[in-house]
């Protein structure tokens, strides 16, 4: 085990402060509409130019291990806020720096850090409750577009595309962001349920020009095992052929004579049929098959449930108005499932989303939910260069997260104004003397975001804070135009969730750093230098009689 270095008390906290300042000073220059750019060197390719706080934070790594711990803790604030709310990373970093800076001065002056932390926690509770009171629910297309625009660093086209996507697939729908081949940013939407499995044989294609199989008013056989034996499938094929409706088969796999028979029947025009593999793997596959069954009003033919393929009747098959299958995807449009069953399934998936601790599982559950409820929209981000494309894609993803957050918990006036308006809640928070210092810290720290926005715009921050404090409700400072306006009317808004998470995460980590009394890091290894080269070879005797 290698030797460790230990820092105690003031020495440790000062090292943390230097690290916090190094990271926060790099990140906070990006805050607000007049935020500056940060250029990040990349080991290959051109440098990255960004105004995204979390991208800047991720790049900061300090040489001194103790200072680096401080920087990494604040980085945690930024990434946690980004994960939960999708935006507010820079605000969270600015708040964490302000809280820790003031708190460390008080601790250095001999005040009890544990009591200060308790005061901070109680003050934050009061502010969060006040933010929720100020919060205004978001409803229409225009407000959604405004949130998207602000989170995308005032890019109106991105805001409009996000609002359009949410309108088309609903707030539960899946919206994904991809890089486009063209220079324009565009939106593509998929109605109904789509999964990533294409036809098992190109002979199922009904539209050779587009290489698609389209089934109108189709019946759907959903089976959870492989089908290789034709005779098991014969009864259901005969019943479907009599009904004259197309048949879609979704199974773990279809091979051998079963697949050959389906292809022959399709080519001869006896039966309009198409077969695809079931989506997903393992338990997730079972769940997705059940989703498809509920959406189409059918049953999963599973031996576990006591159903056998050869005993399948027409009543067990699902139905859909239209199914489109290409070589990669299957889309089921307008399934015949009952609304009550679909809503029951949606409730069940929502409960699973709340219970799960795995981010991966949560993402997959949300995808399943979206496929049942709304649909899928794809925003294709276009740009002139690869550098611009990466930067723009990051902004679109941020804006999308923030817009979802706004739909979840509503909006508050942006530009740091919500924090100023929530300050009144602290007047009623009266605590013992040492804890009251925590309230004082939060009181002044909540001014930090609006001060930084003004600083980045090149305006005197004290004048801005004073004017905003004397105003009422949504009155605030618009740094983009250097004017004082009603922030809600001007469309300068923040999702309540973003403001709440930024403050909660910042105060949580700042409180932990304030109550740190000891730091341990690995001692840097001393380079022993390169080993000495072996001595030179002895001189060679004269080589008599040779001409040179």
From Swiss-Prot:
Its main location: cytoplasm. The keyword Repressor does not apply. Its EC number is 5.6.1.7. Keywords: ATP-binding, Chaperone, Cytoplasm, Isomerase, Nucleotide-binding. GO terms for cellular component: cytoplasm. GO terms for biological process: protein refolding. Pfam families: Cpn60_TCP1. It catalyses: ATP + H2O + a folded polypeptide = ADP + phosphate + an unfolded polypeptide. GO terms for molecular function: ATP binding; ATP-dependent protein folding chaperone; isomerase activity; unfolded protein binding. InterPro entries: Chaperonin_Cpn60_CS, Cpn60/GroEL, Cpn60/GroEL/TCP-1, GroEL-like_apical_dom_sf, GROEL-like_equatorial_sf, TCP-1-like_intermed_sf. ATP binds at residues 30-33, 51, 87-91, 415, 478-480, 494. It is found in: Cytoplasm. It is an enzyme of class 5 (isomerase). Forms a cylinder of 14 subunits composed of two heptameric rings stacked back-to-back. Interacts with the co-chaperonin GroES. Together with its co-chaperonin GroES, plays an essential role in assisting protein folding. The GroEL-GroES system forms a nano-cage that allows encapsulation of the non-native substrate proteins and provides a physical environment optimized to promote and accelerate protein folding. HAMAP family: CH60. Belongs to the chaperonin (HSP60) family. This is Chaperonin GroEL. It comes from Trichlorobacter lovleyi (strain ATCC BAA-1151 / DSM 17278 / SZ) (Geobacter lovleyi).
